């Protein structure tokens, strides 16, 4: 049987078309995976650069300026340096726990990004238990820190891990009560529904004004969860060398470094979602054109605008934890626990009871 040349070319073009479809299918599968990873990476690099520039301004000195324009590539240079550093293991420690600890801490924080809405219907997982899933996942991170401290076979590392666990337990309860108050106020635990509930009343409908006590408690508790000054007792340099990070080097030390800024970014994003109206642009006394209304604009422009508004609110809020680092002194361990158990817990519980009463009266 003789096959014509045109038939051979048609068969080849068909198989070439099928292979191209497979390649495009793989690319479209990878885009939703790598896009959030790239966005989170850039977000962390921007936070590191912002903190260094703001800290330099507060201390009246010159910040990073040689690595890239205005030193914006300094964090990338530090990460590259840590990537090629030698990875040391403690001779008498538990190497399995020592190696798993950083991965547990980073993974638990990365999973928190699943329920954060960056724009109108732009969320990886719109779950009915979104905010409580974040709290449940974030409670795994201290387990990784405790594993790192125990596996290092170092008294300073072990004390740092114990402090991290005690601090997380102490401040997670007030944080949860504040989130529960927001859920009662919004009649939902979905992050998307919480933002939509705030958008009904514009700027004055933000939970910042409806829950001012809860906002202050959430701010303090999130700083403690992120181990930022004045709550950086698990890694206090003057007392514990570097806490649970003492024995780490190379990429594992870099993972802890990244985890702290990832956690800070997650906390700031949740402040934006829970208290600052999320992706909605609500400016009082200033007329906003219809083009900025997410529901009325085109899908692509609305998505881009929502992402921009969410990130703008988040990075503006980041000035608070960054300036707090150079303003307040570190607390003692007893002061930290007393603040969490004797002050924040009763106040957050009272705030929850007030919110519940107001919701019942409004029925």
UniProtKB/Swiss-Prot annotation:
Presence of keyword Cell membrane: no
Residue runs in coiled coils: none
Bilayer-crossing regions: 30-50, 104-124, 127-147, 253-273, 300-320, 336-356
What membrane topology is given? Multi-pass membrane protein
From the UniProt record, which GO molecular function terms apply?
NADH dehydrogenase activity; oxidoreductase activity, acting on NAD(P)H, quinone or similar compound as acceptor; quinone binding
Q: Which UniProt keywords apply?
A: Chloroplast, Membrane, NAD, NADP, Plastid, Plastoquinone, Quinone, Thylakoid, Translocase, Transmembrane, Transmembrane helix
Q: What is its EC number?
A: 7.1.1.-
Name listed for the protein in its UniProt record: NAD(P)H-quinone oxidoreductase subunit 1, chloroplastic
Origin organism is: Panax ginseng (Korean ginseng)
Keyword field contains Membrane: yes
| GO biological process: one example | photosynthesis, light reaction
Task: Tell me which domain of life the UniProt entry assigns to the organism this sequence originates from.
Answer: Eukaryota
Give a Pfam family name.
NADHdh
Gene, per the UniProt record:
ndhA
* GO annotation, cellular component aspect: chloroplast thylakoid membrane
Cite the source lineage. Answer: Eukaryota, Viridiplantae, Streptophyta, Embryophyta, Tracheophyta
Function description: NDH shuttles electrons from NAD(P)H:plastoquinone, via FMN and iron-sulfur (Fe-S) centers, to quinones in the photosynthetic chain and possibly in a chloroplast respiratory chain. The immediate electron acceptor for the enzyme in this species is believed to be plastoquinone. Couples the redox reaction to proton translocation, and thus conserves the redox energy in a proton gradient.
Q: Where in the cell is it found?
A: Plastid, Chloroplast thylakoid membrane
Q: Family, per the entry? A: Belongs to the complex I subunit 1 family.
What's its catalytic activity?
Answer: a plastoquinone + NADH + (n+1) H(+)(in) = a plastoquinol + NAD(+) + n H(+)(out); a plastoquinone + NADPH + (n+1) H(+)(in) = a plastoquinol + NADP(+) + n H(+)(out)
Quaternary structure, per UniProt, is:
NDH is composed of at least 16 different subunits, 5 of which are encoded in the nucleus.
